Amino acid sequence: MMLPQNSWHIDFGRCCCHQNLFSAVVTCILLLNSCFLISSFNGTDLELRLVNGDGPCSGTVEVKFQGQWGTVCDDGWNTTASTVVCKQLGCPFSFAMFRFGQAVTRHGKIWLDDVSCYGNESALWECQHREWGSHNCYHGEDVGVNCYGEANLGLRLVDGNNSCSGRVEVKFQERWGTICDDGWNLNTAAVVCRQLGCPSSFISSGVVNSPAVLRPIWLDDILCQGNELALWNCRHRGWGNHDCSHNEDVTLTCYDSSDLELRLVGGTNRCMGRVELKIQGRWGTVCHHKWNNAAADVVCKQLGCGTALHFAGLPHLQSGSDVVWLDGVSCSGNESFLWDCRHSGTVNFDCLHQNDVSVICSDGADLELRLADGSNNCSGRVEVRIHEQWWTICDQNWKNEQALVVCKQLGCPFSVFGSRRAKPSNEARDIWINSISCTGNESALWDCTYDGKAKRTCFRRSDAGVICSDKADLDLRLVGAHSPCYGRLEVKYQGEWGTVCHDRWSTRNAAVVCKQLGCGKPLHVFGMTYFKEASGPIWLDDVSCIGNESNIWDCEHSGWGKHNCVHREDVIVTCSGDATWGLRLVGGSNRCSGRLEVYFQGRWGTVCDDGWNSKAAAVVCSQLDCPSSIIGMGLGNASTGYGKIWLDDVSCDGDESDLWSCRNSGWGNNDCSHSEDVGVICSDASDMELRLVGGSSRCAGKVEVNVQGAVGILCANGWGMNIAEVVCRQLECGSAIRVSREPHFTERTLHILMSNSGCTGGEASLWDCIRWEWKQTACHLNMEASLICSAHRQPRLVGADMPCSGRVEVKHADTWRSVCDSDFSLHAANVLCRELNCGDAISLSVGDHFGKGNGLTWAEKFQCEGSETHLALCPIVQHPEDTCIHSREVGVVCSRYTDVRLVNGKSQCDGQVEINVLGHWGSLCDTHWDPEDARVLCRQLSCGTALSTTGGKYIGERSVRVWGHRFHCLGNESLLDNCQMTVLGAPPCIHGNTVSVICTGSLTQPLFPCLANVSDPYLSAVPEGSALICLEDKRLRLVDGDSRCAGRVEIYHDGFWGTICDDGWDLSDAHVVCQKLGCGVAFNATVSAHFGEGSGPIWLDDLNCTGMESHLWQCPSRGWGQHDCRHKEDAGVICSEFTALRLYSETETESCAGRLEVFYNGTWGSVGRRNITTAIAGIVCRQLGCGENGVVSLAPLSKTGSGFMWVDDIQCPKTHISIWQCLSAPWERRISSPAEETWITCEDRIRVRGGDTECSGRVEIWHAGSWGTVCDDSWDLAEAEVVCQQLGCGSALAALRDASFGQGTGTIWLDDMRCKGNESFLWDCHAKPWGQSDCGHKEDAGVRCSGQSLKSLNASSGHLALILSSIFGLLLLVLFILFLTWCRVQKQKHLPLRVSTRRRGSLEENLFHEMETCLKREDPHGTRTSDDTPNHGCEDASDTSLLGVLPASEATK
């Protein structure tokens, strides 16, 4: 129907009205306003559909927005988004496959791009995406989705012997297809067997012999973990995507244990032979690849044949035939059946039968041992009979321990035995084994360990031989000189004397000889004979003693009579005879520590440290019968020696019985001074203490060991989880959850080096499994051992501008969680504040005062008593996780200076100011105390406002300490802790210059009341030596500078802050400002708004100070508010106490790595490295905006120093936010070298580059002194969310890959990121170690963030909707009033307004009548217009009665 000519029609989207009555106008106004409000809250008509597919559950994805259908781009699309689509449309979504929509050429809108879903959304548009209609795609990238339920998929095994064997086929899209064997393994096969309800005790898998050529290949590169419920839940290429042929189709058989059988064949009994396995009636062999002794043990145990002998080579057995069933078998030894072991699959066609495995079990051994071709039954070549055949043993690694076992097994005398090389056998077959290892305690040779396989070859083709003898047959002597303790060494063997060749002769050999002859110690060790050459046999050669042998023939040698020497190589030995020897440690804390001294030739002398090591120290401790659990090297507290240096270049093996048995340069031969004297500390566990230091709790940090008062940090060499487990257990800190290597920075720290770690992780104490070595130098690569134990609870306060207030969060196992108010008491708050070095708790809060947390809440109730030093030490009570809502999270406000008081006054509200710092009370210096500080102090003490503050001895002194802390309060703070504070470089303050305060809450009046008409606050009435500062309404400050002592000058006067004009502004004027603010002298009087233009009044102009005034307003000027300036002429000042901070590098432009320098007194100078820690480095980096952490290092060799140093000995807790708050030595300019200066490299800074906004681009990280990128492997919205939140850029809209913002440069720092999305920093997520990646820059990751925080976004969007709707309603109301006015004018001209004369109507009635008259028009024919107005597809409001608005027919009621 046509719209009448005189009808009113308003259309706003779907909301429109057309009425000609007053009520209709009001209805339209309210309806349109409501509709706008609804539209503001996204109440749009959004729809979703799939088109051009096989049905409503497949096809191209289309979204209806603003009445128009459009497609979705495939950028960022994944199966999670497909699942959301299927779920929203009510389609089956147990499997949702996405496809591209390029098969159909489309036109029109592309509504969505970069869609990223979590999977729990109820509609597609609730996922993250670009703005509607914003994209960089074409329709060839339209995304499509196919939704499938379980009913659409199937799995079966076909063409096998039964339903549990055959070719693997999968049903997809109503069609059965095969699976390619690429990536197929036993985990995947196990999923198939379990899904089909088939047994899975043993699984045989391979490829088919008869491929299914007419079927599709559905899956390829399938990878299962083994615990999936269905095969299609495993990772794969995608349905129908493959690069295979049907010759690669997978087949498998699922076996029950009843289908399997094991045997040993080819031996003399059932417990020895070739290993064979029967599967479904067919016997096959096992390939030796990866076979080990544990596998052999499993075979013997399964067959009830005892245990496996520790050799498996049976070269005489006939090889197997038929199939090789198993390959790559690897057992732990605990398995009950061989098929329970891990293996690489069945039917191996690459393994030949010559590699078949054989086993001999202990219950089936048919073995015999003999010595052949010797002088008797107890000497000769070693031979072993196996299966009626004699075999020899290769002499490779053959030693006396093996010979001892042979002698004992044959029942031969073994008080003396020797090993030898035997001549080849004419009877025995080939070498049976070529490497056997015995301890000497075995009862039979086959109880020794061996290398596991038969050997057919032997290096140099030498058989092992043995000579077993009795001690009565042997003797020893030294001949050719006039002393029985000096001469040529001779040995009697088989009734004949013979010599010993010098090959391999050593000090230990000589020590055994001297000890055996009762001749003391060896004096001269090396050298061949210069006596008359002997005759007769050379019995021994290549003698090698350990040093603890009783006889020289007990040492290893080449065999009796086996040598390659002549008699001029005979050994001579010189022993000490009756000489007296001695050893001691002097100058230490006890007899087992100190400087090492040796007594020789009647004199004590020292030992030089050339070549000295822990083995030599161990010999000393053992010789002195001192404990040796931990051995320290170095003098420690002992001084250097004097006199003779007896030994040098000492080299021990560690098992010598005394120090002089070790190799050395000879008595008295050295090239040393006493500065190189050796020191030794011998200790055991009773002298040792273990703790963790430098962490945020007692269960985290670096490993520190205290030995007899000497403290050292454990070096990180060999550091790992096995050692960390022992540390955590010993400290009662649970188990280790993280180990790390941290750099060392302090020169004076001793170190402990792990020279031998045998920790398995199950030991009760670290001393049970580690051999130690003291080091007075740095660790290898300067890295120290650090760890975090499971009992570690690291707290923090977040959500506030100050580090000592905020929402309580506790970190455990890399996750931060908020704490519920019911789980946290005031006692716990006090413990937390003390742990954070934040003083005491002054308040607890509940709710979102400090913002709401995210993720799960803490699942423990802290039951602190209040006296604990760390929150982790409080008793806890577990409760179910996430039982607390985020609106019940607890917040804490701490104050370091809650311990503040006024003492020595008339009441608690007047007196000398004292604060407690680090547990010590002290007064404050009055040098930088001002009225604003006094106001805050009185407010904090609930003592009203400050009346006056005094300097000197106005009230008196009693404090021992005078602290140098300088508070810079504005006057409106509630606590001193909220004021800016500096202490760095503060000079000592002498007594008599301390500050006192009188507050209005005092019970007494000020002794010297201030005079209102005196502008100078320093009154002459104050006693000499004191100064009374009256508090007035004039204040001074510097703003917009880089520190409190530089900036634009502003004065508080008459209730407003204002500026000063630069007319006549000079150093004299600026000097008054600097002195008033305690900022030294003026360096620069800046003009022309150098620090930016101010606002408010310009209070002073044409100042003309002499520089001696106490206040700026005492200088001559035009008068308050009198000027001819603008703010572009605002004056500023830079004072000598102006400080700045930087990291300076001579070659690098990046300001986040280099020498730490401070600007003071007009020049840059360095900072001393004494006491600089990683915590201080972190404060510097955060203060400079260079990241969260820093690494301190020594000066690079190529760098030069600054030449002088400004400050040193900085001490700072990690909770400070500025280095200016740290304690230090006073400011002092002194010459310094690069080695004395601090060098810092900041870490863990993040930025985005290459994007179109500051919140989008390629992700880059500053680490190890350079910028690098992040690889996009596993990059997703969770990782992007962490980046966006860390940058303060709101929430993540998209996680972009493939260098979407261009390729970066430098190192790719992080790869394989795994974030939860609630981490504070990207590097808190799990990832590969720093710098380890397999990516190129074409894979650089990027992000696109919303640009504002979620909180502000949500708040602003709701408020914006309300504001806009209200404005729109008011606008319509104004238009309505204007319309009424126009109607009145028109009626006065044409149709005079008629009002009922019978009774006065209400205003509403008159307005209604006027509207009705005005709106109802007659057409040219005089007929009334119709109300039949077409609705144009919108919702007609003609019959709508809104609440509070009556229809016209009811208006007069």
UniProtKB/Swiss-Prot annotation:
This protein's record includes keyword Membrane: yes
Ranges of residues in domain SRCR: 48-148, 155-255, 262-362, 369-469, 476-576, 583-683, 690-790, 795-895, 900-1000, 1036-1136, 1141-1243, 1246-1346
Pfam families listed in its UniProt record: SRCR
Keywords: Cell membrane, Disulfide bond, Glycoprotein, Membrane, Repeat, Secreted, Signal, Transmembrane, Transmembrane helix
Keyword Repeat set for record: yes
Disulfide linkage: 73-137, 86-147, 117-127, 180-244, 193-254, 224-234, 287-351, 300-361, 331-341, 394-458, 407-468, 438-448, 501-565, 514-575, 545-555, 608-672, 621-682, 652-662, 715-779, 728-789, 759-769, 820-884, 833-894, 864-874, 925-989, 938-999, 969-979, 1061-1125, 1074-1135, 1105-1115, 1181-1242, 1212-1222, 1271-1335, 1284-1345, 1315-1325
Gene3D superfamilies documented for this protein: SRCR-like domain (3.10.250.10)
Tissue-by-tissue expression: Isoform 1 is highly expressed in the spleen, lymph nodes, thymus, and fetal liver and weakly expressed in bone marrow and no expression was found in peripheral blood leukocytes. Isoform 1 expression is restricted to the monocyte and macrophage cell lines. Isoform 2 is only expressed in spleen.
Residue ranges of the TM segments: 1360-1380
Biased composition (Basic and acidic residues): 1418-1435
Secretion signal, residue range per the UniProt entry: 1-40
Membrane topology, Extracellular segments: 41-1359
SMART domains: SR
Region called Disordered, residue ranges: 1418-1453
List of glycosylated residues: 42, 78, 120, 161, 334, 377, 441, 548, 637, 972, 1013, 1084, 1104, 1161, 1171, 1318, 1354
Cytoplasmic side: 1381-1453
GO cellular component: a single term: extracellular region
PANTHER family according to UniProt: EGG PEPTIDE SPERACT RECEPTOR, SCAVENGER RECEPTOR DOMAIN-CONTAINING
Official protein name in the record: Scavenger receptor cysteine-rich type 1 protein M160
Gene that encodes the chain: CD163L1
